[in-house]
């Protein structure tokens, strides 16, 4: 399955929530303007149907998959890893998604969206423990240091981050620490469920794959 490259606001409207796929609060503004209107030319005249249990589970799975920008095959693989890991399967799944390098780059404020973070990783701007890493799906470990390549810091994008002290205004989650001056973040621990998005009902995803 190819990665979705269409209008990202359409995905948020389909799920009925802001998936944070655009910078700032533009995604939320679209939802406020369009309300619960589904995407498509007939969206204004179509009411959202009452979903079956399966439909509710599917929508929750799709919502989380789209938040993190993960394809179905990879998402299913993460679920398989979660089922074989000690702990509640749903919470472990979310923890795995949070540990993706592109998500950590986003959480540290190097990028304003996960899609942009994925590009920064793909283009070789990000280092893990001092070594260039260009795999967005790489999972970080406790103690890993996430930085920006010295060569990349000379580029306009990162020079602007430094000159405007934008990273000084970033408040990363408690499981990450950030040295804005060095452009380095450290994975202090793995995130607990309480630190993750409370609007996600991961049990619905477990039920979906358990059918």
Curated annotation (Swiss-Prot):
> What are the start and end residues of every segment in region (Disordered)?
27-48
Q: Which residues form the S4 RNA-binding domain?
A: 99-162
**Keyword Transmembrane on this protein?**
no
Matches recorded under Pfam families: Ribosomal_S4, S4
Show the GO MF annotations. Answer: rRNA binding; structural constituent of ribosome
Listed SMART domains: Ribosomal_S4, S4
- Give yes or no: UniProt keyword Ribonucleoprotein: yes
Which terms are listed as keywords in the entry? Ribonucleoprotein, Ribosomal protein, RNA-binding, rRNA-binding
Function, in words: One of the primary rRNA binding proteins, it binds directly to 16S rRNA where it nucleates assembly of the body of the 30S subunit. With S5 and S12 plays an important role in translational accuracy.
> What is the recorded name of this protein?
Small ribosomal subunit protein uS4
Source species of the chain:
Herpetosiphon aurantiacus (strain ATCC 23779 / DSM 785 / 114-95)
Q: Name the gene that codes for it.
A: rpsD
């Amino acid at each position: 399955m190819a990665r979705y490259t269409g209008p990202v606001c359409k995905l948020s409207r389909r799920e009925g929530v802001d998936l944070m796929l655009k910078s700032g609060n533009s995604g939320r503004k679209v939802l406020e303007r369009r309300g619960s209107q589904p995407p498509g030319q007939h969206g204004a005249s179509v009411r959202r149907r009452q979903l079956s249990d399966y439909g509710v589970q599917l929508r929750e799975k799709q919502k989380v998959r789209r938040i993190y920008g993960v394809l179905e095959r990879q998402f299913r693989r993460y679920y398989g890893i979660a089922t074989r890991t000690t702990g509640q399967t749903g919470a472990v799944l979310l923890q795995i998604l949070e540990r993706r390098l592109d998500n950590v780059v986003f959480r540290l404020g190097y990028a304003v969206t996960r899609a942009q973070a994925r590009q920064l990783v793909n283009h070789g701007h990000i280092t893990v423990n001092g070594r260039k890493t260009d795999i967005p799906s790489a999972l970080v470990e406790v103690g890993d240091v996430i930085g920006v390549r010295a060569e990349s810091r000379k580029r306009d994008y990162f020079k602007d981050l430094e000159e405007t002290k934008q990273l000084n205004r970033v408040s990363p989650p408690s499981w990450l620490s950030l040295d804005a001056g060095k452009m380095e973040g450290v994975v202090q621990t793995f995130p607990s469920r309480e630190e993750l998005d409370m609007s996600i009902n991961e049990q619905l995803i477990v039920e979906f794959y358990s059918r």
